[in-house]
Swiss-Prot record:
Cofactor binding description: Binds 3 Fe(3+) ions per subunit.
Positions with a binding annotation for Fe cation 2: E69, E102, E165
Role according to the record: Functions as the terminal component of an NADH peroxidase (NADH:H(2)O(2) oxidoreductase) when using NADH:rubredoxin oxidoreductase (NROR) as the electron transport intermediary from NADH to revRbr 2. Plays an important role in the oxidative stress defense system in C.acetobutylicum, an obligate anaerobic bacterium. Also exhibits NADH oxidase (NADH:O(2) oxidoreductase) activity in vitro, which is 100-fold lesser than that of FprA1/2 using the same electron transfer components. Therefore, its predominant function is most likely as a scavenger of its preferred substrate, H(2)O(2).
Top enzyme class: oxidoreductase
Pfam families for this protein: Rubrerythrin (PF02915), RUBY_RBDX (PF21349)
Protein name: Reverse rubrerythrin-2
GO biological process, one term: cellular response to cold
Gene (UniProt): rbr3B
Keywords: Detoxification, Electron transport, Iron, Metal-binding, NAD, Oxidoreductase, Peroxidase, Stress response, Transport
Residue ranges occupied by any Rubredoxin-like domain in the UniProt entry: 1-35
Reaction catalyzed: H2O2 + NADH + H(+) = NAD(+) + 2 H2O
Induction: Up-regulated by heat and oxidative stress (exposure to air, O(2) and H(2)O(2)) (at mRNA and protein levels). Various other environmental stress conditions such as an increase of the pH of the growth medium from 4.5 to 6.2, addition of the salt NaCl or of the solvent butanol, and lowering the incubation temperature also result in transiently increased transcript levels. Is also expressed under non-stressful conditions. Repressed by PerR.
Length: 181
């Protein structure tokens, strides 16, 4: 038995010859092609790092946009917190929604660049475990310095973020161990 695919709607038919008419979309026999490879290939998909080797100005623009989008995420979330403090919850929610959209933009620039993400989940998890450990240590040092200089509010905020980084790293390590070790 052979398999035939309707190129209009994707319907797969199994038989000796393509059907006269697609039972799903009604396309004629001429719209069927024989399926030769049964692999899981897709017609197209997103690829990480497609900007490698592009024009220097384009590459710099992609990097600048990635940084800008990341900055906007933090800025908009901070603005959302301020709007909440002032009693404007709808404004806060708009900032949060837009921050998420900016995060999506940043993720697309990250994928194009392929510098902070690779096409391998195990490697990405390990990179994040290592990065969160470094971020935790860096924030702990900053919090300790702020405490030493009697900047209590800065110490408290940064120290709490230090603990968040440890939690993030532990979550990533748990996933790494569960799926890859």
């Amino acid at each position: 038995m052979k398999k035939f695919k309707c190129v209009v709607c994707g319907y797969i038919y199994t038989g000796e010859d393509a059907p006269e008419k697609c039972p799903v979309c009604g396309a004629g026999k001429d719209k069927f092609v024989e399926v030769k490879d049964e692999g899981e290939g897709w017609a197209d998909e997103h690829k990480i790092g497609i900007a490698k080797g592009v024009d220097k100005e384009v590459l710099e623009g992609l990097r600048a946009n990635f940084t800008g989008e990341c900055t906007e995420v933090g800025m908009y979330l901070a603005m959302a917190r301020q709007a909440d403090r002032e009693g404007y919850p709808e404004v806060a929610e708009a900032y949060k929604r837009i921050a998420f959209e900016e995060a999506e933009h940043a993720s697309k620039f990250a994928e194009l660049l392929g510098e902070v993400v690779v096409a391998d989940t195990k490697t990405n998890l390990q990179m994040r475990v290592d990065a969160e450990k470094g971020a935790c240590e860096g924030k702990k040092e900053l919090a300790t310095l702020a405490k030493k200089l009697n900047y209590d509010a800065i110490h408290d905020t940064v120290h709490e973020m230090c603990k968040d980084e440890a939690r993030h790293g532990s979550a990533f390590r748990g996933l790494l161990n569960r799926y890859f070790k």
